[in-house]
Amino acid sequence: MKRLIIILITTLLVSNITAQDPNRFFPKEDLILSGTYYYPEHWPRSQWERDIKKIAELGFEFTHFGEFAWSAMEPEEGKYDFEWLDEAVRLAAKYKLKVIMCTPTPTPPAWLTTKYPDILIKNENGLIVQHGARQQASWASDIYCEYVSKIVTQLAKRYGNNPVVWGWQIDNEPSHYTFAYDYSDNAQKKFRQWLKNKYKTIDSLNEIWGNEFWSQTYNNFEQILIPNQKELAGTANPHAMLDFKRYTADEAASFINFQNDILRQYASANQWITTNVRPRTASVDPARMDHLDFLSYTRYLVNGRHKGYGEQGFRISDVDPIGFSNDFIRNIKGITGVMEIQPGQVNWGRFNPQTYPGAVRLWHYHVFAGGNKFVCHYRFRQPLKGSEQYHYGTLQTDGVSVSNTGKEIVQFNKEINDLRKEYNPNSKLPVHLAKVKTAILRSSDNIWEMDFQPQTDQWNTMTHLIKYYNTLKTFGVPTDIVREDVDFSVYPVLVAPAYQLLDKELIARWTKYVNNGGHLVLTCRTGQKDRNAALWEEKLAEPIYDLIGAEELYFDHLPTDKWSIVNFNGNSYKWNNWADVITPKGNTNVWAKYEDQFYKGQVAVLNRKIGKGTVTYIGVDTDDGKLEKDVLKRIYNQVGETYDLPAGVLIEWRDGFYVGLNYTSEPQTFPINDATDKILLGTKVTEPAGVVIWKSKK
């Protein structure tokens, strides 16, 4: 109740305040600003000025304070201490550094969790998550939110009109990390209320959830428990599970929006507000955090999770961790920045290798190439104590010597300053790129639903989506990851990978898009269910039959040790993950067929002209993506000019600059024309983890 009152009061106070246009905070001629995290509370005060001065000397333009400092800001309940933070801000101003100020809400102090242990989250095994790390408090706790309101209000009043404070970061990486979902009593209570608000009556919920199945029918909302697969003898109700994931994403967004609204009451209009999301955190949907001025993100790349390309790929990473994040988060509010990026070797990965020489600089240029307005390096000094002792910083453990990877960041800072002199405010996306600009349609609902009901152990929705993204990047096409609320018509090509949950209104929009000249690509699983994750009371995926010009007969999977063949253009491709078996009708063109199994000769890929455009349906999912790449290449040959780049080689364009990035383990030659192009940085033949930047002389 207290939280509800706080939110209602806040809503009334900020009812006339909306998210600001973030572009005004970032002059285009700056290209990208570079900053670093600094934790004054970790170091003797006698070292602060030395450290902050060095931040400026190394070419950083802003610093970042406070996201884990609640116990330093409020050491005892109601006793606030900002004097130390005032001094840090004063020193930043002295050395002409901007400051990103943070709310410290991911780390509630011990006095709070001891006094109110019921604010802590509970995991799916019933374990209460203890004090001692971060993100252990429940967003659904009214008591927790009451204390959040108090500390955020104090910060906002103190720094909301301080000209040194450039902007605000709310919380840090909103999530519960390995404890992705909260099963606490607080969450249970809020989930029931969320369901009441959505369905109004228990009869409506029973109908949508299909609760006649297994006698799950409820008499009232109080009987409903959070669906917990660990506590069930059979598979959880998929409709209940989908709603729980929607609720969790709404709760996370509410927590961020709630803090945003408090800050906005007191913050100057010259200060922006954001949070830093982890783009692939399944329990959070960044688009729901719609009160913010913009979203930023966190990215770590070398930690044993990414194979990369070639012998040294594990030290450089894949192209998609930064690339996909750029193109996804940027399109939520029109801009983005990287609030936290890996500085070198870390401490928490599956294994923690040294990064390849140049890799950290490469990542910073990938951030730049993706249109980001700033990049913030985590962290300036390597900690001597605590859980991240072996986490690199710009400086080594002596606090004065620049680390090997820190030197790469300092180099980037200098080079960006030089690159600003080449900025042309009149630059526009070249025509050959505009003709092939592409959108990939992404839906949190689809990811949640299919990953709960994958149908085969080999299925992963994000892996499927990323495969298409990485393929498009080998063509060098400008790519946006978008939601359904965008104008499809601005994109010559629209790809909707495995878009299983949809409605007939979306199908009508797709049809209009194609009729007007767009090129639509749909893939396996698309159209099988409605928005509530119910199968249509029609043939399998029948609502899309008229659009794709075919009927889907059934789908198939194979064991992991067996492979079957698809033939496309006389070439054979292996698959064993997913196969939609389809029968074309009318004037539909057959592009690929299955070569074996009992459905030998049936169709795997088809293409159809409608009006001025085309629709292509790729019904098979391969592991290596070679079939999908060749099919997409055939489509783009009809649309415009593209590159043919090796996997791990990127060409991006921003603000008049072509940026070539080599994520591979071998030297790569970029298609730079000596007669018409001018190299600004690097060389045409680029070493592993190397960068080349050029612009057209025209």
What spans do the regions from the language model cover?
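Sec-dependent N-terminal signal peptides
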Residues: 4-13
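N-terminal carbohydrate-binding accessory modules
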Residues: 19-62, 75, 90-94, 98, ...
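Aromatic- and acidic-residue-enriched carbohydrate-binding clefts of CAZyme catalytic domains
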Residues: 26-31, 56, 64-67, 73-78, ...
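The substrate-binding groove and active-site-proximal loops of carbohydrate-active enzymes
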Residues: 33-45, 66-83, 130-149, 174-180, ...
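Short, acidic/polar
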Residues: 42-57, 148-154, 277-288, 356-364, ...
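Aromatic-lined substrate-binding rim segments of carbohydrate-active enzymes
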Residues: 49-129, 153-156, 259-267, 500-501
